[in-house]
Amino acid sequence: NNITDWVIAGARQDERFELVAVCSRTQERANEFAAKHGIPHTFTSLEEMAKSPLIDAVYIATPNYVHAEQSILCMSHGKHVLCEKPFASNAREVRQMVETAQKQGVTLMEAMISTLNPNFAIVKEHLKDLGTIRRYFASYCQYSSRYDKFKEGIVLNAFKPELSNGAMMDIGIYTVYPMVALFGRPQKVEAQGIRLHTGVDGQGAVNFQYEGMNATILYSKIANSSLPTEIEGEKGNLILDKIHITNTVDFIPRQVVGQGQ
């Protein structure tokens, strides 16, 4: 998919990187991908690829429900792993992944671009300008191109719970990840959402409680929103145009209208 193409293009900007192999379920698809990107070796068995001395690290961009299994397999053979978001289907699987990485002495990283965006560093740098922070609000609502098919009775992968898909796993995570990166683990969580007939969440809203601060996230694959993300402090606000890939960050200082206002 496009994301994999972007990752490869970005990685090739580093002269230390060499793309040596690809693994796919069929030889035909492996050959097609290898030809597209100039990859010398192909595999149809992930275990065989994980055992290969040709490889130092693996990028995993498979369906969500196999992320943990495949990451653990690769790490068990001493390979570093960059795994697409979401890391896994649940917290138990994530713990198993982290434990395997620690045991094997390898690097395990989630491919979450939003907190690696240069503008996210700007946000972190200027949090102090906000004074005491009182609220984090983030919204990522994007009508899915696959939802019209869903309403026609054609259920594509994006709306299949058995693949660990759904709105939170696909795009809601982009609103949560920066929040935790900036403010840590919340004290309390309350959530509500709309569940589609297949069992996946189509959209949702989650409230988080921190010491002296509230956080709210909105996410959807069945409706659009143009709302930006905002971090509100007693001395001003930071406004991010898009939480998943931030292009602009604006600081709006609190205006003192008059004494007692």
Where are these regions (language model features)?
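N-terminal Rossmann-like dinucleotide-binding module
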Residues: 1-37
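Hydrophobic residues in well-ordered beta-strands that form the structural core
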Residues: 43, 83, 108-110, 240
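Rossmann-fold dehydrogenase core element
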Residues: 95-113, 132-136
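Beta-loop-alpha module in the N-terminal Rossmann-like domain of NAD(P)-dependent dehydrogenases
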Residues: 7, 37-100
